Amino acid sequence: MKPLHLKLNNFGPFLKEEIDFSKIDNNELFLISGKTGSGKTMIFDAMTYALFGKASTEQREENDLRSHFADGKQPMSVTFEFQLNHRIYKVHRQGPYIKEGNTTKTNAKFDVFEMVDGKYEIRESKVISGTQFIIELLGVNADQFRQLFILPQGEFKRFLISNSREKQGILRTLFDSEKFEAIREILKEEVKKEKAQIENRYQQIDLLWQEIESFDDDNIKGLLEVATQQIDKLIENIPLLQARSKEILASVNESKETAIKEFEIIEKKTLENNILKDNINQLNKNKIDFVQLKEQQPEIEGIEAKLKLLQDITNLLNYIENREKIETKIANSKKDISKTNNKILNLDCDKRNIDKEKKMLEENGDLIESKISFIDKTRVLFNDINKYQQSYLNIERLRTEGEQLGDELNDLIKGLETVEDSIGNNESDYEKIIELNNTITNINNEINIIKENEKAKAELDKLLGSKQELENQINEETSILKNLEIKLDRYDKTKLDLNDKESFISEIKSAVNIGDQCPICGNEIQDLGHHIDFDSIAKRQNEIKEIEANIHAIKSNIAVHNSEIKFVNEKISNINIKTQSDFSLEVLNKRLLENENALNNQRDLNKFIEQMKEEKDNLTLQIHNKQLRLNKNESELKLCRDLITEFETLSKYNNITNFEVDYKKYVQDVNQHQELSKEIEDKLMQLSQRKLIEQNNLNHYENQLETYNNDLELNEQSIEMEMSRLNLTDDNDIDEIIAWRGEQEELEQKRDTYKKRYHEFEMEIARLESLTKDKELLDSDKLKDEYELKKGKMNTLIDEYSAVHYQCQNNINKTQSIVSHINYLNQELKDQQEIFQLAEIVSGKNNKNLTLENFVLIYYLDQIIAQANLRLATMSDNRYQLIRREAVSHGLSGLEIDVFDLHSNKSRHISSLSGGETFQSSLALALGLSEIVQQQSGGISLESIFIDEGFGTLDQETLETALDTLLNLKSTGRMVGIISHVSELKNRIPLVLEVKSDQYQSSTRFKRN
């Protein structure tokens, strides 16, 4: 993330201020300078607040950021533009406040924009979602931003001294190590699921084992006493258990089969005895009923005599009935003959009337034939009448269009000839344009090289002048420095260390006398007077301090000048003067103008030729289209003429309407004549068919009448013969016998029933006598008791066998399930063993007690420390090295940092360093962290860093080393900003962002020393 522009309104001491960071060239190191309280740190607060809604230091609340001099009606807001991964973003955050005159607070606002095609497009417009968008975009939260981008007062060393858990949060974000923690959680859940499945399988095995039936058998009970956790023993006992269960089942089955056989024997005996008893009873009953039936024999004989007489008179009765039917048929035939004769007379009359109509119709035959001939000849014309009608309508229009198309075609041909004359022999020359473009490009390149060389030479002369001026200043300051050092060397430094011993000497003098032995040197005291001029010593010390201060200031100036010379030398080395053309700039410009004019002329000529060619092609296409239309017109005109000629030749008409009217009239007349003729023919045909039918009917009726008369005569003869055979003299005898016919069916049924029952009794008595012959009837009660006893025993054993068989099969199913569970469990334990081990290792149960994520973070921290030690060695004069504390526990340690002192060859806690040493270590660690993050693909772009204070704790030599380190960051593409009150930094750092305050508001400006 690299700042581009910062705009502050009513923020801290800045009422309305803008800072343009784009003025910082090539990622220069710059100093933010100003008096205490001027608002230097507020610049860092503004950037942090714009991004996260918080200050750069945790102690400052949001309410503390609003200016006390702000207009009560105006909000506090910060607009911050920055670059990230070659994309530009802008954020605008407005703080909440109570507007003057209101009692309710105006809510905060936050907008996030991204530049697309030179314009800002909004991405978020809500405070919470917008802040989350920034966190995801930068890859850090506010606390991590303070440790990576902005190192505020009091927090610069926070990453250095933070514990493992705090470092873990920062490094996790920087190096995207959460995926390793996710892996650990996934493995943990997998192991948990697998263990639950394994435990569940053990429970299923135990449940199945407990449900196995023992049949109250000691052997099986002994086998079931094995614990279910001993799965190998279970596998060993299962075949024994199954074998013993089969033995028990076989024993029960044997008892069951014996009981079934005994029951079947008694069941058969009981059934046979019951059947015999029933047969004896049935035989006795049938004999009694048979005797009663024989008593009806006389009555049945009388019935049979009546039935015989009824049967003998049947033929006579049939002849009498037949006579009546024949007489009825004769009467009907006579009626039919009379009706048919009348119908034939009516049909002959109708035929005579229709013959008259036919003769009248045939008189118009010649006229109808002529009309049919006309219709046949002109039918094809009438069917396509629209075609001929359209030809009459289109012929005049087509003549006019043809003449117009001919005129237009002639005009286009003349235009084409004119265009061809304009083109002549000219052709487009694009190769010449390419050649001229290449020439112009080469000339422009030569001109640019000359201009760049002139600019580079001017810059070089300027830099050489600056360098010479700096060298002269260094020479002058070196000369002054030598004089001061000579002057310093001339001072008598003896007794200078007694300046602060005046009170000590006075105390000794008051405690001794002349002649005493001196407690310091042991000599005899000769005099107690003032032998030392303390005022003179103090004066010399002040003079020496002043000279030393001047020497220190001159050395600082020389160091600054040397740094500036180094910077100038870098710029000089970057200046490149290229080889240029021998021609002057004036000659090249003249050649450039000539070639550009030639290029424009050739382009105009090519454009004209292309336009003419395009016009020629257009005219050619138009001529082709006109010719096609003219050809089409001529073809259509010829077709119309041919159709009109055809119509007039065939129809002899020259008017379509008259032809249509006559044609339709002829068709109507012909159709009417044909329909009437057909109707008459149909009527004659129908009359002829009807007469033929009636004639056939008449012949049929006459033949029937003759047949019926013959039948009647034969039937009378048969009646006389039957009456003679039956000795019947008149019809009264016949009527009496006929009266019996109403009872005939009842009499026949009574006779047949008697004979049927008589026969059935004979058959049944014979059958029962054969079944009971030579058989003894047993005691039914004794058989019944024995039957119930055997049946109960059999049912009991069948139930027992069914239960044992079911339990045996159930035992087999359960033991098979147990074996299946055990096999699956063994395979599952084998398959999951590696996952269990891996889960324990990544969870920290290993020889280093490290989780997978911390192991990865330790790797990155080691790289960061190694990179930091490269600078720390320089800054500490090869005394200190940062090392990672090796002590770890429970996977959450291993990220603490200690310092190794090469002078004592021992490591010690980081808190034992002095303030300056802590600053050196923190700076080296911060720079190492940023460089390792840049090398890795953690998704965070650390393109800038801002440091607030810390340099005041450094001595002169360490300060020089730290500044050189920060200056060298320019080559890594990092922007570095520093807040410090150290005066030497103003001389060492060329670019300064100066913050001035007038006790009311502050302002900023960039300046160069």
Curated annotation (Swiss-Prot):
Coiled coil: 176-364, 392-502, 535-802
One term of GO molecular function: ATP binding
InterPro entries the record matches: P-loop_NTPase (IPR027417), Rad50/SbcC_AAA (IPR038729), SbcCD_Nuclease_C (IPR053380)
GO biological process, any: double-strand break repair
Keywords linked to the UniProt accession: ATP-binding, Coiled coil, DNA recombination, DNA replication, Endonuclease, Exonuclease, Hydrolase, Nuclease, Nucleotide-binding
Keyword field contains Metal-binding: no
Annotated residues for binding of ATP: G34, K35, T36, G37, S38, G39, K40, T41
Similarity field: Belongs to the SMC family. SbcC subfamily.
Biological role stated in the UniProt entry: SbcCD cleaves DNA hairpin structures. These structures can inhibit DNA replication and are intermediates in certain DNA recombination reactions. The complex acts as a 3'->5' double strand exonuclease that can open hairpins. It also has a 5' single-strand endonuclease activity.
Subunit structure: Heterodimer of SbcC and SbcD.
Protein name: Nuclease SbcCD subunit C
Native source species: Staphylococcus aureus (strain MW2)
Gene: sbcC
